[in-house]
Amino acid sequence: DFEAWFDIPEIISRADCSTGWIVANMASHHRTLAVFDERIQREIWDDNPNALIAAGNIYQQGSAKKVEDGIILTGLWNFCSGIEISDWSFFAFMLDDNGTKDWHQCILHKSEYEILNDWDTYGMKQTGSCSVKINELFVPEYKLQSFSVNRDGHTFKGLDLNKNLM
């Protein structure tokens, strides 16, 4: 139910804003995973059907270099809500592939990034929206998804598996 996707976090937020914020974010992140390659979806859900997915801020805060079968990712992402309780997280970055810039996200397991203990905000302290640092990490192609939908030949790999994203 699409309306429930909005209603439930709103109701929870009446009692606890931080919890409502995390519920809303986590729901949208699980939906985003549906457009990724089937291999990473199965890697996540087969291992743990209750896996939580956070997101490094959707604005690209990292950079990547194209290499054979993937990328090398480096960056500092701030305001990663729910990162401390999540098993996985998305990270946005700009890929410069021989002068062609392409906005991407990748998904990484918590063992692949460093969480910085820098979230010291009074109002939404319990969201655990710490920063994340990644330095020269190889990310295989199947964990990447381009979100530059206006370019020729763009596809969402996961649509072969998930016909209805809602």
Stretch-by-stretch model annotation:
Residues 1-86:
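Glycine-rich flavin
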Residues 16, 37, 109, 139-141:
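Generic structural signal for alpha-helix starts
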Residues 55-58, 99, 125:
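Short solvent-exposed loop/turn micro-motifs enriched in small/polar/acidic residues
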Residues 61-63, 117-123, 131:
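Short Gly/Thr-rich strand-loop-strand
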Residues 72, 90, 131-133:
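Structured core elements
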Residues 76-113, 117-118, 128:
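DPxDG-like acidic metal-binding loop motif
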Residues 122-123, 129-166:
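Glycine-rich beta->alpha junctions and the first turn(s) of the following alpha-helix
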